[in-house]
Amino acid sequence: MRGKEVCALVLIWAMLLVLSGCQSQAVQEFPLTKFKAESMLDEGIRQYDNGDYKVAARTIQGSLEAGLTTRSQARAHKYLAFMYCIGGQQNQCRDEFRRTLEIDPKLDLKPEEAGHPIWGPVFKSVKASMPKQ
């Protein structure tokens, strides 16, 4: 090899060595398990949308156990609350909405969710009972 080629290879090697230790913060904070958990949550929501509530509840609970991001944890608890309300389990519905709001106190339901005759009033009641942040 010529001198220039050797210098170029050494420079490339040095750059690769330096860059290998520089992961973005997003990559460092979002390990592979979170991708799996997020995927499980998405699947659980699809199951919910298809009316398969028992399977959806298990999948969404599994996504929580797999390690969702904070924002997705709130979303998961919200969907669990919806399913408990649909199933007539008002206490569990309230508990899930409470967990949702403990994670994300500023969360509001989408207009189409807030207008639901079963869980809309429950969410409103739980939110009103939460300490102001």
Stretches found by the model and what they are:
Residues 70-73, 103-118:
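Boundary/linker segments of alpha-helical solenoid repeat arrays
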Residues 16-37:
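Bacterial Sec signal peptide processing site at the extreme N-terminus
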